[in-house]
Design a protein with these regions (language model features):
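FAD-site-proximal beta/loop scaffold in flavoenzymes
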Residues: 28-51, 138-213
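Mid-to-C-terminal Rossmann-like scaffold of FAD/NAD(P)H-dependent oxidoreductases
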Residues: 187-249
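Redox-cofactor binding/interface segments in oxidoreductases and associated redox assembly factors
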Residues: 13-14, 56, 133, 146, ...
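A Rossmann-like FAD-binding core segment of flavoenzymes
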Residues: 6, 73-172, 222
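Phosphate-coordination loops involved in phosphoryl transfer and adenosine-cofactor binding
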Residues: 1, 50-53, 113, 128
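Glycine-rich dinucleotide-binding loop and its adjacent helix/turn
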Residues: 10-73, 170-172
Length: 249
């Protein structure tokens, strides 16, 4: 932004990721609210009246975390579920039906099997937004929010002599293929010997660990991150869905 050049001996890339928006929804971006920054949150708060109605698209775990919070403070939430439902968890069809039932019991309205073909401004006297379904019909709400997974923010790294797949490829010590560059957080894929592939590790507990390990290794350490994952969606003692990705300690 400032067109500055800063030299470095070692670089940590922790640029994170932004919300992924499927191609079929991109033309409607101006009519949707994001949650990628503090400014986005302020705009969302301003757009939403008391006991307002939020329509969520997709249904990844970030969105569901917000959904349960909105319901808890008195708002109505309708989720138009897509293929990103419960992402990044991989949930089988039988378990998905069970988790959807629990989600509805938590107060979230879930719409299944509908393809969104348009988002429009509401007509006079109606809520501010209308989501239109293929084959007819739709739903009105005060705000529309897409939660369709994450896309690593790494375009600026092209040409930096690092290997890139969907994210920056790093070893378990979080070093890229460039000996001067490390990466941590949603921007990187870590080599997992257990899975014999590069994996993303989402959630605050993973990201916090990555930051600590990257700092240690950039100052001479050789610490490796644990690449074993047991991050399953589950139903807690209160009978609600819960996830390790919702751990913020």
């Amino acid at each position: 932004r400032h067109k500055e050049e800063v030299s470095y001996d070692k670089l940590l890339v922790a640029s994170g990721g932004g919300g992924y928006l499927p191609e079929g929804l991109r033309e409607f971006r101006p009519l949707m609210n994001g949650l990628g920054s503090y400014e986005d949150a302020v705009k969302m708060r301003q757009a939403l009246p008391g006991k307002g109605h939020v329509i969520m698209l997709g249904g990844d775990m970030t969105g569901l975390d917000l959904a349960r919070t909105l319901v808890a403070v008195g708002h109505e939430v309708t989720l138009v579920a897509g293929e990103q439902l419960f992402w990044p968890h991989e949930v089988g069809e039988k378990k998905e039906d069970k988790f959807v039932a629990v989600l509805e019991a938590m107060g979230v309205n879930v719409v299944l099997g509908k393809k969104v073909t348009a988002i429009r401004k509401g007509t006079k006297g109606k809520p501010a937004r209308r989501v239109v379904f293929g084959g007819g019909g739709g739903i009105d709400g005060d705000a529309v929010m897409p939660f369709c997974g994450l896309m690593p923010s790494l375009n600026f790294m092209i040409g930096a002599n690092v290997d890139i797949e969907r994210g920056l490829l790093v070893n378990p010590e979080l070093k890229t293929t460039n000996d001067s560059i490390w990466a941590a957080g949603d921007v990187c894929q870590i080599w997992s010997p257990e899975e014999n592939s590069y994996l993303f590790y989402y959630g605050w507990h993973h990201i916090k660990e990555m930051g600590n390990i990257a700092g240690i290794n950039m100052t001479g350490g050789k610490k490796k991150i644990s690449t074993y994952q047991d991050d399953h969606l589950y139903i807690n003692k209160q009978g609600e869905i819960d996830s390790p990705y919702w751990m913020y300690r």
